Amino acid sequence: MGNSLKAVVAFVPSNECQKYLLEDLEEMPVDKMVDLSGRQLRRLPLHICSFRELVKLYLSDNNLNHLPPELEQLQNLQILALDFNNFKALPLVVCTLKQLCILYLGNNKLCSLPLELRLLQNLKTLWIESNCLQRLPEVVCELTLLKTLHAGSNALRALPAQLRRLQELRTIWLSGNLLSEFPPVLLDMPFLEVIDVDRNSIRLFPSLAHLPGLKLVIYDHNPCRNAPKVAKGVRRVGRWSEETPEPRKRSGAVIEITLDEKPSPPPAAKPEPE
């Protein structure tokens, strides 16, 4: 019923949308998903908070700047999309949703993240791109199961050394920031598979050949004087990428990566939890 709900709501004028949902949506959708993206909502209809078995809630592309405390009732929620809204601060009620695996916060007005974010210890994917972050909040380094971090299009100049704690992190997207050097902490993260530092101000790249898990490095649109050296089988996207990679120092299967894996804006259909 989640998809049918979206289709029905599309025929309701935006100023009547919230009233319609409150009065007519009486049962939780069978697929345990509610998608209210692009509905010009200024507040979350409280009735949604009564669907305690809800797993996926998409609120992207609205006019939200706060969330009701009743959202805490959704303790089975695994995916929450709040991107493309007007949040200047992350509502603390989000940090009570301890089953969250995927959290989309991109394209808001966030300058920081609350310490309470550390409570989301099941979080595996965090998108905080296109906000107003001048530094990566250290609380992110406490999300020990995090596998994917998208922090592109902010104003980051460096990364905290504590990031090395994230031993499950496989993909980090840092394009469109203010990095003047390749973040040293990434050299101590051997399990990283994808590193994107496109569109920064990095002039000199260190060798990445010692990172055994690396599959793809994107470094285009930097004023660099060299290409990062990588092990054989690692894909590079950027200037001088045709140079011969260094031989891999350990045996292992070569996994091909295509240019299609370069980060892009969040898709209309968000990925499922792993």
What residues fall within each predicted segment?
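The feature captures the LRR N-terminal capping module
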Residues: 1-152, 157-161, 171, 184, ...
